[in-house]
């Protein structure tokens, strides 16, 4: 066979294989005017290499992969920290940052390595569009046999440029001095006017957020894991959950002796679900995501077993299970509803926020699959969010096309109206957060339906109950939510309890058909903080509605 035909044959073969195992993926990568095949690249995770940053060398990667998106290019990352030299070959979207850097050479046919800033050592990166072009890494694009070009700049030109250079430097120095002086002046004014009693010390807030006393994992163990580069000594116990992409095991994380261990949860993805594992790993790896109402992440691992390659996510274990299971088995009190609902809202509010409680910038994240089975119940009866396999980071660099390609995802029963009919406002990233708020409202309804404060408590049933089948499709939910404008029923008996009445008013605003009319998760969290003392409410909620003494609520939309 001619050598030129081998990459094409491999590409078509892999495409047929992927298309047969994932029809949805094949559909996404087709166009109206015919089939457009994605790029083939070398795809090996970070590993040790003998390749030096001189001349050129081979990646020695034996894995060829089809890129997930048509616009992705081949890329390579070479790093040297102390005496360790590593190489990573991947597919990469050139419109996104890779390790904090934008790659401006994605149109190149060859992988020409360029040095990038890296606090931990030396780093070179490249990107290219050729077939498996990241297999050969070129560290020097200069021909050593080509003579150096003579400097044609005359002395007159150099002399004429010197005054301009001096003036430019002077302007820069003056501007910098002015900005520094202005900044110091503003800082002094801020320190003078701020009232310390209204602000917690940043270190105190961070300590509260990062040291989760209600987790089943000790802080010492978690700290050691975060700095461990070897596979953890884990013994799988029993399966405690199973979803579309992975199975969840209760497991033992062994300590110094065989008698000592920590109980952890291990979410195991098969080889075919690498993309879901990577999405969730990337979400969890954001240090600014840590929050008491978001599942505590320990580490991610790639493991080789007798069944093939597996991808693991290791997290804290919560014995009470997910919220759906808990509500099925238990009737809750008003105080339980207040704790569960308030903690759920706080977790979603942190997920959606663009800053941490300490004020550090943070990329907002939308969950996109909020439901009671994706929420865990902790020992203190507060919630924590989990299962971020469909989540999306709302990076400002994302274009409308990027957002459009994110697709219609989630569980049909919990999908917002605009998601069901694929009519989201992609120009406004807040629209993604509004879909999470709709789903949150349905979960709050589930909690309320099992609260003994409403009187007689019926058996647990999910939102829309018997109106749809157990696993409804999108078309079935369209009939209920769009055509009939249906929502879960709120019996009049629920309104006899002042606190539950206010919860109902809140969730009705959250599942409004108009996304712009819905509350934010932060607003819901603030309301729940007031609901604890519902019988004493006489002020305003975060949406500025008046709450009369008789307990009735008039909502201002």
Curated annotation (Swiss-Prot):
Active site location: 369
Alphabetical list of Pfam families matching this protein: ecTbetaR2 (PF08917), PK_Tyr_Ser-Thr (PF07714)
Every Protein kinase domain range: 234-537
Disulfide bonds: 41-74, 44-61, 51-57, 67-91, 111-126, 128-133
Annotated compartments: Cell membrane; Membrane raft
Catalytic activity: L-threonyl-[receptor-protein] + ATP = O-phospho-L-threonyl-[receptor-protein] + ADP + H(+); L-seryl-[receptor-protein] + ATP = O-phospho-L-seryl-[receptor-protein] + ADP + H(+)
Signal peptide (UniProt feature, chain positions): 1-23
Binding-site positions, ATP: 240-248, 267
Side Cytoplasmic, residues: 177-557
Entry-linked PANTHER family: TGF-BETA RECEPTOR TYPE-2, TRANSFORMING GROWTH FACTOR-BETA RECEPTOR TYPE I AND II
Family recorded in the similarity comment: Belongs to the protein kinase superfamily. TKL Ser/Thr protein kinase family. TGFB receptor subfamily.
Name of the protein this chain belongs to: TGF-beta receptor type-2
Gene label: TGFBR2
